[in-house]
């Protein structure tokens, strides 16, 4: 939504106007078919939709009432409430962590919502606590079981699995400089600008770059 608002959103399949904004939603079941495992009053997570008529939607789903297949929604604890929208971001983090030949990250770029979830899921799944880079002092708080540092204070150059959750497309040279030979960099954010990096350093280290998209139903 920020990129759409600022006009910086690059051409993307499904992008057009009129546009239904928003992504996932949390709501209360008002009506359910007979025999469904959900009942009226249940709180559910609702993924976005591409099923709008005469309108475009980049997974949009912002509406007072939604009609959806029972197989697409996920029942959540009522105590979670509106925070249940984070299920999508958590599933996106899991999707990045379970890619082909994926390894747990030992470095995460960015301590926003996705970066925090990547770090927490890594630890819960049995991985070693990763280092997280963050340049905004306000975002350095809230770490539990892992360390958040400013990249300028990190002298390591032996990271083997780097996950980017910042969406920055202009910093790959810095990340590669902190990598060991054969390291993998996972681009888990969304990038409005072209990805650029100097080839010689990446060539000498034989860096692998993997792109991770949004979550799939299996991740949920």
Put a short name on every predicted segment.
Residues 177-195, 209-210:
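ADP-ribose/adenylate-binding Rossmann-like module
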């Amino acid at each position: 939504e920020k990129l759409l608002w600022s006009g910086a959103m690059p051409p993307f399949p499904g992008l057009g106007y009129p546009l239904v904004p928003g992504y996932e939603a949390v709501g209360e079941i008002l009506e359910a078919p007979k025999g469904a495992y959900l009942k009226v009053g249940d709180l559910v997570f609702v993924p976005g939709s591409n099923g709008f008529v005469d309108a475009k939607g980049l997974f949009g789903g912002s509406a007072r009432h939604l009609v959806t297949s029972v197989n697409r929604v996920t029942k959540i604890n009522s105590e979670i409430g509106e925070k249940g929208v984070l299920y999508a971001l958590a599933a996106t983090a899991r999707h990045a962590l379970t890619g082909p030949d994926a390894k747990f990250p030992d470095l995460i770029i960015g301590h926003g919502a996705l970066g925090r979830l990547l770090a927490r899921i890594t630890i819960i799944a049995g991985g070693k606590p990763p280092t997280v880079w963050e340049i905004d002092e306000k975002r350095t708080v809230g770490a539990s079981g892992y360390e958040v540092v400013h990249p300028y204070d990190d002298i390591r150059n032996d990271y083997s699995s780097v996950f980017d959750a910042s969406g920055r497309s202009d910093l790959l040279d810095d990340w590669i400089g902190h990598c060991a030979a054969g390291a993998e960099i996972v681009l888990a954010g969304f990038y409005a600008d072209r990805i650029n990096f100097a080839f010689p350093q990446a060539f000498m280290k034989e860096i692998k770059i993997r792109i991770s998209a949004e979550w799939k139903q299996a991740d949920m």
